[in-house]
Amino acid sequence: MRRTVLLVTVLLVFIGGCLGQMENPRPTNNPSTSHPSDSYSTLPTTKYDVLKEGQEKPVVNAINSFTFDLYKELAGNNNNVFFSPFSIETALAMAYEGARGKTAEEMKRVLHLPEDDDARWTGFRYLLLSLKSPEGSPFILRSVNALWVQRGYSLREEYLGIVKEFYLGEAKEVDFQGNPAEAAREINEWVEEQTNGRIKDIVSGLSPLTRLVITNAVYFKANWSSRFRASDTRNETFHAPNGTVIVPMMHQTGEFPYFENDDLQALELPYEGERLGMLIILPKEGKFEKVEGNLSAGSIENILKNMREEKVKVALPKFRFEASYKLRDVLMDMGMKRAFLVPDFSGISNGENLAIEDVVHKSFISVAENGTEAAAATAVTLTMNAPMQEKEPKIFKADHPFIFFIYDRETGTILFMGRMMNPKDG
């Protein structure tokens, strides 16, 4: 039996007509407008596909820095946390491409986006192309973007081109004004299809004032490189903040990247294909708040650099839960106020004043045993040799709250971040 991780995340940015104030719009160099169906029907090959070492780094650094800023906002209680900073950053970056003036300045600062257009465009295009699992890959990973536009509403041709070329996003026309229920159904069907049915009915009650919905969906499914045997799973105690609970605990002993200091243990479990891995940060007794408070892109990078292959005896709970967040207030608290209150999205359209109505993020994770391993055997012949002093394996027992990341080992991009406080809380 294999242990499979299934991760799904969806982000929706609702942009509607704004009846309030708006910044004085900055003129754009290209005032032409277009309906989504009129332009960019095929994905062009551009100079941005010429690979350069490190070209994705500015965007990776932005995503990883944003990860910890957002985590601090979401982790204000003892609940489980799970979100995709990659998904959220990507969708908001698409909105940023149409922001102007102080609205753009605030968004750039909160999202840590590169100042240089080419660096931003190159980085996102590279990541979105690079992170798509190829045919025959041992894991499934896809990130897809779409713009849902009010039928007949004109978007700037320049904006449509940027989203199509650099964010690989497709534009679809719906009728928010005349039939918002049908528009919601179409978006929900798309989300359900892109997430293999894991996330349903994410949109409801759309306003007739809605002009644009920006969506990003990320889906990931993989097996561990080193499998847990179902026969080794047993019910054990997990020490949650509000008391102990009994959970199924997985066990195995193997060679894994490992790091330890006075405050924490860190373990990496690679997935099949070795491209992606789960990094688990397990604070030592009484150190959770200290470890959590010190988390940053730099501290995680330092842990990864100092990991060494060690023999580790691993105990990890099975868990499965959904998380749903409305991020409007969170993003405003982080400093992104103008996008909601006094916006300038004149780079998206020449028409009505546009404002972000809300940002909705929904995610799902399942870490469980499934599938079958049939008729496989390995024979190893051993001969007696002089006894050697064998090091005792490190003990990594995740029977109390821990923090985890799913990240791309090639670029260092954090795709998902979570906090497991109680595996029983689904």
Swiss-Prot record:
Residues 26-42 have a biased composition (Polar residues). GO terms for molecular function: serine-type endopeptidase inhibitor activity. Keywords: Protease inhibitor, Serine protease inhibitor. GO terms for cellular component: extracellular space. Gene3D superfamilies: Alpha-1-antitrypsin, domain 1, Antithrombin, subunit I, domain 2. Residues 23-42 are annotated as: Disordered. InterPro entries: Serpin_CS (IPR023795), Serpin_dom (IPR023796), Serpin_fam (IPR000215), Serpin_sf (IPR036186), Serpin_sf_1 (IPR042178), Serpin_sf_2 (IPR042185). Disulfide bonds: none annotated. The record marks 385-386 as: Reactive bond. PROSITE patterns: PROKAR_LIPOPROTEIN, SERPIN. Belongs to the serpin family. This is Uncharacterized serpin-like protein TK1782. It comes from Thermococcus kodakarensis (strain ATCC BAA-918 / JCM 12380 / KOD1) (Pyrococcus kodakaraensis (strain KOD1)).
